[in-house]
């Protein structure tokens, strides 16, 4: 009553009147309702939003937008609206002053509306100042205001049309003007304002249009339409992609995660374990002695912190970093879930309307409109939710990849052993992807229970306590699902472990492929990969069985819930009638229930997978980091007067839980000194340099360095970039300095050889450079950086005597470019030693002697004894200044020197060195040096010489042949059986629902019961059982078929890659191949079978829904075909772009892995040059490039879904509309069936297109696997028809007949018309300058490259006519770069297990390794690290010698095999070869000419041609090329 008096002066105007508004054929709202509710609703909306929105804008300033015409118009209209409201208010005051009785509402409403319009105007300007280009808050406000005004407008028009209507001219005119202005404001709010000043969008040449899109465009994803149109017209290219939004870039995302992780680690008080090394107590040792004997065991005392640490929580860190943005998705999801239940409730109203023949028609149309609007709102809310989830997932992946990359740059060497390259790549690819996938569905953890609870609540209202039967079924399923989740986790862990092992092995195979081919070991390693793959597939098969059972329970649970509920409902009381309303409203609710019940186990499974990945990432990110602070660094100006390097009583170790590698190191080096470090293999020379670089853990002592450091590793690390960029290494080009460095490092002649000079791309790991060229590039990089301290780890080993002498004189020596720099040179060359300032003699991890050359000779210690012995025994071959004579023999027992350090026996008990190769503490990377560098320069343009082929994206539609290939890989029987079972499942589902509609139409008997109840129930149950059997069958068939396909596709890929020629690996970045074996194969393993199941399910569901709608309302046939056409067009329109975006994303992913691999291999070089930040930026850039393709693809999904769901919503609209129109001729059961199916069709259509797109985008993985399964292959491995006899070659006679060789068809010859015959048993040396064609000759002999012309005859057989393995098994090579693989030492010697242990031990003894291997705890089963890291380079070289001794073939090739070892090791190898290969033909490519002076012949190559050939003594007499080389080496 009070409200009536508030609305009218006489209290005659109620707020609500059912007779006026509902029970009438011409409904209207009361005046009071119009003046209060319809006027106040927009006001209350804006005022309720204002506080939070104002706070949000205050904290998120995006910049200042200049006043534009659009903004001026909106502001002006806001003032006009305010004026209209105040005019209405003043008019009311005027009326009151005239004595009229006015209702209070006429004063209150204009006042409230006027203040609200003022607030709206203020917000328009405040948004402009804060950089808001389009406001969702304001657009919603104007929309609500317009809708409310529209109802009032209709009422005013109806009133005005009445004859006796009283017209209030002023108020009506004011309202019409108000309505017009609100409509204009709404239209203007649909447009976006200009970009803020100084924003990223203004500066970006290709900005993402999202940032400047209007609110309406953003919620409908209209802003991406331009790209979709472009993609439909022609295939998208990477240049068409927009820049990432700033908030999605690595620059923004990664630092936040890394900082939060650091804070979490501090909170968890995760202190590293301290390890104190102490000797065992020895009562016989003098009390004052502090030095340890190398042979004494060292105890490690592990001192743990007193309090128990908890592990840092990565989940907390992820939540803290991404939670706030992600929380917005909660609101959208909650809104969507609530709107979802509007459908069944409106369905109930429609069924009641159909049953009520007296109800006015407009109510049916209203219900139809409500159903359509609720469906549309549901669509918009759902896809905003998905968009936020996908963007969050993308950001998480970016952050995780960035964090892993940054961590990989700083972890310790012991940590690197526990995380191999393959495992870290998996962290970046598979584990990061798991988080991405989980972000989409994690909200289902709370949403699914909410949906289930609401569904059960509405079911209780509909069916009463009978619903408890359904609840009981669901509760019974909980423990079952829990057990399955635990099992899934177990299988997931096992699967990831197998995958890590496989990727690790594949990485090693790809890095060592050249060695595998030379040894003909491809089959052995193929078997190793397949064994791991077999274990992986076993786990996948178990997971498939589990998935089949899971799918069976998930699909059948909703049906069992419905069956049990209906059964209890109709049997508990005979009077309970299952009518259309109860059945189909319940069925609609059961359909809602189906999704959370189906998705929840999948979400649990995803969470389980993500938890495994979370743990793996946490372990990796928790690895101990190197401590650069362990070495004190001073700048030149701050450290004046100090020595350049000072080391006091320092002890270093490679791993904290292992004994030290270097003990009691003490020395000081003044500024500008040249220091040589000499010693035997494995004595700690390279470790000393690594210690100075802070690559090792310092146990005790003090180390100080003054100035910047440059480092040249023992094995050169080369990037996949141009020669120039490898030398500049991120520094600006200074032409004069650059040329001086190139000349000093003897690189100018090489520029003539390279096709595009220093702009030639030199390939991944420098594949097209020789070993010497790579070493000189590495040296040039260091020299160019102009540092203060140079650490040079044997840089002269891989170059010939002439070049070595040149480099020492021009770069390292007293008159070289570095003459004023502090230099520490690890070397084996005696001739350099008289010119150095200080010599450090290493032995057993200690400094045995130290002093100048003359001081050490005067001291008459081990060094002096060696020099005298060497001079006496070798004087017939070399003078004392032989530039390549090695420093060795320094490990032999000698009397104790002054500081009490013993020099231990070299062979007796060598120190096992963890990392002589300190270039990267990783895989040996240089094995792939091909002599492409020996090409003649022939005016090839710069842009034509790209050695490495970037990963290419296919274009256009995925060919049907790809699907057919996948079906064949599955097996055609299984494929067609799966389709048949899918059909059975959906036919039985349709039949059961149609049966239900017939059941609901049964008329109750006179006594109020249904006569056919039990029959109906039995058939309904039987159809459900048939559905369950079909579900289990197709799920099992698809899963098992998927495993068959995965096995076949992997095998094809592996076999083809291993059978590819070396040229394939030289031009294909390893990242491309790793991508195929990791991400693409994971898609085939895990994704494609799931997508097939969902695609087939969606397809049959859509067909079924259309059939039901057409059966119920045949008139729908008028609208279904046009909507079908729209659907088809939108789908094809979308797929064209989506498919190409997926391809571009896949292609841009490969460089991320390639760069990551490259970084891991050269991490110590990067750290030494302090280039971490530059490499981090490069990595971030590559990740962002990858996400540039991914982001449009997820938005395209949303674009499609919104449009297709609109098509689906139209089907709902027309199904309900036709049901309302035909209500007099339709039964309630058919109406219920039709509308309930139409409610589902939106989801089905959405899933169908998503799954068809997912199918096409994921099948791209098959396409990409097939791409590398069909590349050109090298010649057959075995040819039975031409296989040589087992005794071949019996003498070892090798004949080159007019032999020519080129590396590619478009390149020049590198060997030109070689004609030479080498008799069986001859020992032939092959010499020549760098790039002369020496290595090319061996590549031709092993047919790594096939001949361009001519032939090679071995013992009468043309090697081109026999199989490659027939050839390569019969020739042995000891390569320049010794490559070992992870696995046992025995496997590295004999991968085919052809030889007995006795034969292996004999080979080790002859290779001088027996003592070393015997001292190892596991002997032959000693586990070699990845790339043989835990052996020194010299020890690895001796392992290669042992391989050759085991094979004992008639032809042996040494490709600069002793270049990187000291003279003693060289002598050991040479003496073994002379005795053990006495009857064999030996071809030696040599830099140390003294090793071939006793050979029968020497071949001198120059520019691919034989210049000289003859006995060494003859060639010396000729005084030609060989004589000049011998002279440079000091041999004449």
From Swiss-Prot:
Membrane topology value: Multi-pass membrane protein
A GO CC term attached to the entry: plasma membrane
Modified residues (N6-succinyllysine): 504
Organism: Rattus norvegicus (Rat)
Sequence ranges assigned to domain ABC transporter in this UniProt record: 645-869, 1294-1528
Matching Pfam families: ABC_membrane, ABC_tran, TMD0_ABC
InterPro entries from the UniProt entry: AAA+_ATPase, ABC1_TM_dom, ABC1_TM_sf, ABC_transporter-like_ATP-bd, ABC_transporter-like_CS, ABC_transporter_C-like, Aldo/ket_reductase_CS, MRP
Full protein name: Multidrug resistance-associated protein 1
